[in-house]
Design a protein with these regions (language model features):
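Specific alpha-helical transmembrane segments that line the substrate/conduction pathway
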Residues: 46-57, 84, 92-125, 164
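Membrane-helix interface linkers and caps
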Residues: 61-79
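Loop-to-transmembrane alpha-helix entry segments
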Residues: 73, 104-108, 120-143, 151-158
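Membrane-interface helix caps and helix-loop-helix hairpins in membrane proteins
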Residues: 93-98, 146-154, 176-177, 203-208
């Protein structure tokens, strides 16, 4: 019994540190995206394509080094790559009019609410923490997006970020059924690369 508490505490601290590191990485992602677009160093199309390309290359190399294969023809790629492309496109273009903090708030709120809603509709009983998280996320979104509120939000930018949040939530939910997380993720990025590039090209390619 004496050894159980330190082990449980160590597990909690490990989870806390990994979660904090993940959230910092997500926040840095928003900041770097906004800086790249606002400074003119890249347009949304170029930034999105570079992100997908980098992910595809790194993940594909990891799969090959482990002796795995890329399941590119799996039906799972329809939802996986499609939702990933939706996230990448909406996320990058939205930062033309949204600042980093506001964009991240909308994105994380929508992801939380979407995953909670899907879980509720599929019969999964929500936990107290899930209910609390969804309530906080919904309250934050309502405060930010309320038409008569004090925060001025570009409607198109907000809509694009909402779409990105739905895409990321769908991608996360679809990933739960992947038999091999690394191979499935790598395949999603590889398939999403031409989809993202083509969609942005058709949409205009360059934004001012």
């Amino acid at each position: 019994m004496c050894k159980a508490r330190p082990t449980r505490y160590a597990g909690f601290m490990r989870l806390f540190l990994l979660t904090s590191l993940t959230m910092c990485a997500f926040a840095a992602n928003s900041i770097l995206n906004r800086l790249a677009i606002e400074s003119g160093a890249s347009d949304p199309a170029g930034f999105a394509v570079v992100r997908v390309l980098a992910g595809a290359v790194v993940l594909a190399v990891l799969v090959l080094l482990k002796g795995g294969v890329l399941p590119l023809r799996s039906p799972r790629r329809i939802i996986g790559a499609g939702s990933l492309s939706l996230y990448m496109i909406g996320f990058s273009v939205a930062y033309l009019t949204l600042d980093a903090g506001l964009g991240a708030l909308i994105l994380f709120g929508v992801v939380q609410i979407t995953m909670f809603a899907v879980g509720a509709m599929t019969g999964a009983a929500p936990t107290v923490r899930q209910l609390a998280g969804a309530t906080v996320a919904l309250g934050g979104l309502a405060y930010v997006l309320w038409p008569a509120g004090t925060v001025q939000v570009d409607a198109l930018g907000a809509a694009l970020m909402v779409a990105a949040g739905v895409g990321w939530a769908a991608y996360s939910l679809a990933g739960r059924s992947e038999p091999n997380a690394l191979e499935g993720t790598a395949a999603n990025f590889v398939v999403a690369l031409p989809v993202t590039a083509l969609a942005l090209l058709v949409a205009g390619g360059t934004w001012q």
